């Protein structure tokens, strides 16, 4: 088949092991594992949390809805902020807000159901977009042929946290009753916040990322105006030579 277009390039993706992943971005590695432990606990046992508080079935369904829907709503604004500022700073802020909201659930959650929903919603708003920011931070340090393998390895790390989270938090909920869920979350956020703060101080910044420069999408093909301008310039040069 005759065509002016070149054949697509087929290249084998570079394999990224767990060691390579941590070497590329310790923040992404620990962040994915830590937030996986949070997801496995908070999203897996939030209904159990409500049941142990003595909530009705309808109240538990509202609690589960808020815990999921509010986080989904904040995916875009948090992502926009992470594209504007240093992603490590955004991750640190998310950690701090999640830590404070977890403590507030423990202290004020028993006051009323509406207050409980408020702080669970705040926790969801900052915890659910966390993993997306972690992935974006990792991609800042990768070559094109590393993205697929690194993403799959990061998913594995996150899945390990998802598996361990419910197992560990069950012990907390057995000892501290319902609020053991958020005692557990608070402890995980403390470690994540400390590690993130350490990476902010000593970690490297991606060469392709400049927090003071807004991102710009560049088309892979030339626009019609650009093609017309280039054509006119070529014609004028030919006329000059003649």
Regions inferred by a protein language model and the residue ranges of each:
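Intrinsic disorder in cytosolic terminal tails and internal cytosolic loops
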Residues: 10-13, 199-242
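Structural signature of the two symmetry-related core transmembrane helices
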Residues: 89-104, 186
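Pair of pore-lining "gating" transmembrane helices in MFS-fold secondary transporters
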Residues: 22-41, 121, 125
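Loop-to-transmembrane helix entry/capping segments in MFS-fold secondary transporters
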Residues: 57, 142-154
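Helix-to-loop junctions at the C-terminal end of transmembrane segments
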Residues: 75-86, 173-174
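Intracellular juxtamembrane helix-capping segments at the cytosolic ends
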Residues: 128-142
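C-terminal membrane-cytosol helix-exit motif in multi-pass small-molecule transporters
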Residues: 1-10, 192-200
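A membrane-interface helix-boundary motif in multi-pass transporters
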Residues: 171-189
């Amino acid at each position: 088949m005759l065509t002016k277009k070149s054949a697509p390039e087929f290249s084998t993706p570079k394999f990224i092991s767990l060691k390579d992943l941590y070497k590329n971005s310790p923040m992404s590695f620990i962040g994915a594992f830590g937030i996986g432990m949070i997801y496995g606990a908070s999203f897996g046992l939030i209904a159990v949390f409500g049941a142990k508080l003595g909530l009705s079935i309808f109240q538990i369904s509202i609690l589960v809805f808020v815990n999921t829907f509010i986080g989904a709503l904040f995916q875009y604004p948090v992502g926009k902020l992470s594209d504007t500022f240093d992603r490590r700073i955004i991750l640190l802020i998310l950690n701090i807000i999640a830590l404070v909201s977890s403590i507030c659930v423990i202290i004020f959650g028993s006051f009323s159901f509406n207050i409980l929903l408020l702080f669970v919603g705040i926790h969801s708003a900052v915890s659910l977009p966390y993993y997306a920011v972690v992935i974006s931070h990792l991609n800042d340090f990768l070559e094109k042929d590393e993205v697929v393998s690194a993403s799959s390895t990061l998913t594995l790390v996150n899945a390990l946290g998802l598996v361990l989270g419910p197992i560990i938090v069950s012990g907390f909920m057995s000892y501290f009753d319902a609020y053991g869920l958020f005692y557990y979350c608070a402890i995980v956020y403390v470690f994540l916040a400390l590690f993130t703060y350490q990476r902010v101080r000593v970690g490297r910044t991606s060469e392709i990322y400049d927090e003071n420069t807004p991102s710009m999408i560049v088309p892979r093909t030339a626009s019609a105006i650009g093609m017309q301008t280039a054509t006119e310039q070529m014609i004028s040069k030919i006329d000059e030579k003649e």
